[in-house]
């Protein structure tokens, strides 16, 4: 991860310990120019600028959705930038906001095998059974993308393996049964019990 203007990785790690601010409703009352500036700062790894904008009184830039539908948390999750994921969550980024496809950052993390980020999002209130526009949960995506570690993490967090999507009508368990080349995923679904109650509900689009 590139960090500009004299920041070190240690400095950014220290910034992650700042107490989080409450997550706000996506997009409401946000200054678009500040929001776009924040997204650009995050994309460019400019920690000083990101902090400057996020620390403004009443700032809600952490939940600003850009013109393509992404929040900063979507962007850094796709780029697998764990330090930025932590920074944004500690600045009040809502892990339940969907992008233009309805994918939450957790769904994205599940699809690419970004286990550390997924665990942090769940700890910060990500809804494990939130769905995208196709009706897919993070677990369904993890099963389809053959991500056993994410499947295990999500099941332990209470993900429902029998929640069918809207497109095929298949559930994560159904997808796992059809994937005969990867029987370990079905074994996980059949054996792992949740260690905490699942949080479900609609995403913010």
Residue ranges and their predicted role:
Residues 2-11:
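Bacterial N-terminal signal peptides that target proteins for export
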């Amino acid at each position: 991860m590139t960090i500009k203007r004299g920041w070190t990785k240690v400095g950014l790690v220290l910034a992650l310990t700042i107490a989080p601010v409450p997550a706000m409703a996506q997009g409401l009352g946000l200054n678009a120019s500040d929001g776009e500036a924040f997204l650009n700062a995050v994309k460019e790894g400019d920690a000083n600028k990101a902090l400057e904008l996020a620390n403004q009184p009443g700032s809600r830039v952490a939940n600003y959705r850009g013109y393509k539908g992404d929040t900063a948390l979507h962007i850094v999750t796709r780029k697998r930038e764990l330090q930025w994921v932590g920074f944004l969550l500690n600045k009040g980024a809502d892990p339940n906001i969907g992008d233009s496809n309805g994918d939450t950052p957790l769904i994205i993390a599940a699809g690419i095998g970004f286990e550390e980020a997924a665990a942090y999002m769940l700890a910060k209130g990500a809804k494990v059974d939130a769905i995208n526009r196709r009706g897919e949960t993070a677990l369904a995506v993890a099963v389809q993308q053959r991500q056993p570690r994410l499947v295990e993490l999500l099941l332990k967090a209470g993900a429902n393996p029998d929640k069918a999507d809207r497109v095929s009508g298949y559930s994560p368990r159904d997808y796992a049964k059809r994937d005969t080349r990867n029987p370990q995923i079905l074994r996980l679904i059949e054996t792992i019990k949740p260690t905490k109650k699942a949080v479900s509900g609609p995403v913010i689009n």
